[in-house]
Amino acid sequence: MKFASLSVFFPAYNDAPSLPELLRKTFAVLDAHVADYEVIVVNDGSRDHTAQVLDALVRELGPRLRVVTHAQNRGYGGALRSGFAASQKEFVFYTDGDGQYSPAELPRLMECVGPATGLVNGYKLERHDPAHRVWIGSVYNFCARLLFGIRIRDIDCDYRLIRRELLDRMQLTSTSGTICVELVRKLELSGCGVAEVGVSHYPRQHGSSQFFRIRSLATTFVQLMKLWVRLVLLA
């Protein structure tokens, strides 16, 4: 039986080289496994030819592919918030537009959905990144568990399937990568069922991550502390 209703979206920043293969694979998976779906790409102020690539892909793949365009880069949190706001189906799945996760594993997340399930979160079976990124990711996961009581094993794995009605009830405010902590913390506090699935992680083939630049790391740290004050200290 096919999954009933699903929005899939990808935040994208200078991801033009990876988007064609990623989107074609996504449509193949959804055609086989989902009855009613839509695919959204949030072009977060890309400076490469992402816009032109997406225009061509809309012509190729048809009206089920929509593009949300930010004139200026709003950060990872801003891109996710736009993706959630644009999603119209019963469940929402998102992962990054850089191709480090494969849409082929999405059916494994869908299989975990039950009547009470609100979140199915992936976790990396093995991380294929440079050593400094692996170390920073481990520290970030540790801080998320220590400061926020996050129970999932990999907050840094952006491969998530979420019941949309839960998203509609919450107000997300983060503009950086801390949105993942805010999102999961609020979902766990809602009392919804949570499942976890191990997924493959692949080396990045094109471009570089925004998150691991000094300025981005500093912004993330400041926002993480502000989030802790609001969601934990003052809660």
Residue ranges of model-derived segments:
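Acidic helix N-cap motif at the loop->helix transition within catalytic regions
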Residues: 17-21, 48-57
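N-proximal low-complexity "stem/linker" segments adjacent to membrane-targeting elements
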Residues: 1-28
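Acceptor/aglycone-binding surface of glycosyltransferases and processive sugar-polymer synthases
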Residues: 68-86, 91-94, 100-177, 204-229, ...
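A conserved acidic beta->alpha catalytic loop
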Residues: 43-52, 99
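Cell-envelope/extracellular polymer assembly enzymes that use nucleotide-activated donors
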Residues: 5-7, 38, 182
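Donor nucleotide-sugar binding loop of glycosyltransferases
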Residues: 15-18, 46, 76, 102
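Catalytic donor-sugar/metal-binding loop of nucleotide-sugar-dependent glycosyltransferases
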Residues: 151, 172-175, 184-202
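Short beta-strand/loop segment that forms part of the nucleotide-sugar
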Residues: 35-45, 66-70
